From Swiss-Prot:
Chain intervals for the UniProt region annotation (Disordered): 387-415
Gene that encodes the chain: mdtA
GO molecular function: efflux transmembrane transporter activity
Pfam families, per database record: HlyD_D23 (PF16576)
Biased composition (Basic and acidic residues): 394-403
A cellular-component GO term for this protein: plasma membrane
Protein known as: Multidrug resistance protein MdtA
Cleaved signal peptide residues: 1-21
Description of how the protein assembles with itself and partners: Part of a tripartite efflux system composed of MdtA, MdtB and MdtC.
Domain of life: Bacteria
Length: 415
């Protein structure tokens, strides 16, 4: 009896398990059927998409004059730098410049107390006047002695002595004249003037201080910035190109760009080339000169130098984005009239971040693919589309209304 009841319990449990399994399967099949259809439909759509021409962007190779530049790093240096010092000793009485001021050669910069130099000049002038009178008297005596000598009233010895006295007085007079000139020069040097055109820096000494000609710091440093120079370096491999460009007889144009190489500061000309290569760095120094009338360049400023050495005429130019690299070298995808692509191996020339010169393998007017290149195969047909601008991206899709001013305002308020 107990075994019969036990068997009946197992049968009932089995029926329940089978029923639950059937229910779960039915629900799973009901939910999977729509998604399976969707996946199947998506697969068919994907197949249709795969057979459509790949969208690409293209550009036309153009013919133009392309400049060739050599680039290097450099530092702006003053054309001349002078430490203005006093040539005489004395007390600094006045300063006649403002720090940072542009001055001309000969402008008064400072004054030393001139009192002692005026006194010395007066003494020298007095001595000169005295000795000039002495010389005049000696010459008159000599004239009388010469007259008396004709009648033998004076001896030859006395006549020679008087002649020597005149010569001595003449020598003394010349020494006095030199002393006067020296005293005048000392007085002139008490007025310190600018030796060159340039910009004065910060003053190194204040009014009232005792200064001397032996002071090494000087009164102020004067730098000539109109014109101003740029000293930059180029690799030794560029020397031949520079020398060849110089032999053409035309001045080489040099541009100074800022530290980030994004803004051109000024344009000048190559002034000179160093006579030896730096063996440590393998570079050579060059110097360019700039008028710098707008003061765009400043001494010790770091800049990027670009020197134009040649211009390639009628060069075939394409966007850099079109140039690709493969196992056989550089190549581009060229479009024919039917918008089918073919791979062309090319030889490149001058290149920058935006464009590249093609020296072989392409002609002006050829169309090259610039975007969508990764989907291309030889002979594939493509659909050339225009590059989407920011304004186009902001336009609403067809059937979608543009937001009104009130909607934009409400969105702005929520944000």
């Amino acid at each position: 009896m107990k075994s019969t009841v036990k068997k009946r319990g197992w049968v009932i449990a089995g029926i329940v398990v089978v029923a639950l399994a059937a229910l779960l399967y039915w629900r799973y099949a009901a939910t999977e059927a729509p998604s399976g259809k969707a996946q199947h439909a998506g697969g068919r759509a994907a197949m249709r998409m795969g057979s459509a021409p790949a969208p690409v962007q293209a550009a036309t190779a153009r013919s133009e004059a392309v400049p060739r530049y050599l680039t290097g790093l450099g530092t702006i240096t003053a054309a001349n730098t002078v430490t203005v010092r006093s040539r005489v000793d004395g007390q600094l009485m006045a300063i006649h410049f403002k720090e940072g001021q542009q001055v001309k050669a000969g402008d008064l910069l400072a004054e030393i107390d001139p009192s002692q130099f005026k006194v010395a000049l007066a003494q020298a002038q007095g001595q000169l006047a005295k000795d000039r009178a002495t010389l005049a008297n000696a010459r008159r005596d000599l004239a009388r002695y010469q007259q008396l000598g004709k009648t033998n009233l004076v001896s030859r010895q006395e006549l020679d002595a008087q002649q020597a006295l005149v010569s001595e007085s003449e020598g003394t007079l010349k020494a006095d004249e030199a002393a006067v000139a020296s005293a005048q020069l000392q007085l002139d040097w008490s007025r310190i003037t600018a030796p060159i055109d340039g910009r004065v820096g910060l003053k190194q000494v204040d009014i009232g201080n005792q200064i001397s000609s032996g002071d090494t710091t000087g009164i102020v440093v004067l730098t000539q910035t109109h014109p101003i120079d740029l000293v930059f370096t180029l690799p030794e491999s560029d020397i031949a190109a520079v020398m060849q460009a110089q032999k053409a007889g035309k001045p080489l144009t040099v541009e100074a760009w800022d530290r980030t190489n994004s803004t051109k500061l000024s344009t000048g000309e190559l002034l000179s080339l160093d006579n030896q290569i730096d063996a440590t760095t393998g570079t050579i120094k060059l110097k360019a000169r700039f008028a710098n009338e707008d003061d765009a360049l400043f001494p010790n400023q770091f800049v990027n130098a670009r020197m134009l050495i040649d211009t390639q005429q009628n060069a075939v130019v394409i966007p850099t984005a079109a140039l690709q690299m493969g196992n056989e070298g550089h190549f581009v995808w060229v479009l024919n009239d039917d918008n089918k692509v073919s791979k062309h191996t090319v030889t490149t020339g001058i290149q920058n971040s935006e464009s590249v010169v093609i020296t072989a393998g392409l002609s002006a007017g050829d169309r090259v693919v610039t975007d969508g290149i990764d989907r291309l195969t030889e002979g594939a047909k493509v659909d050339v589309v225009e590059a989407q601008t920011a304004a186009d991206a902001a336009k609403p899709e067809r059937g979608e209304r543009a937001p009104t001013d009130s909607a934009r305002a409400a969105k702005g308020a929520r944000s």
